[in-house]
Amino acid sequence: MNGDKLLKIARENPDVAIEDGTHPEPRSKAKSSGRKRSSLEQQFAGTWAALDGPPLEDEYRFHPKRRWPFDFAHPATKTAIELEGGAWSNGRHTRGKGFIADCEKYNAAGLLGWTVFRLATGMITVANVQDIIGHIRRKEAAK
């Protein structure tokens, strides 16, 4: 990866400091569902795009009966990415009811053949995103 690509990633991710210590301006893009992306979703989407990841669907409903959405999904390879915000602020994903609901969702996804990658705040790194892209590419090649 060259320096231009890394700089692009840094500029597209407001939580990342650029080498000179400045922070890029935050950006907000509308999701296909009509709501705005969280800063964590923006960070992931920006990193994914900068690394030339394959197209993903956001807010993808994978279950035939339940209305559970994945934050991002690559349906052709049954690969999902779930962003787990609020780990340090007693967010929904870490409180009892939300945690149990997430367990039900992830278990149902597994039973349907989905691979779910869970990324918490601080885990959206070039290395982790490249690992997910590699997983998708390998599954595509195996078809």
What is each of the regions a protein language model found here?
Residues 1-143:
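Nucleic-acid endo/exonuclease domains
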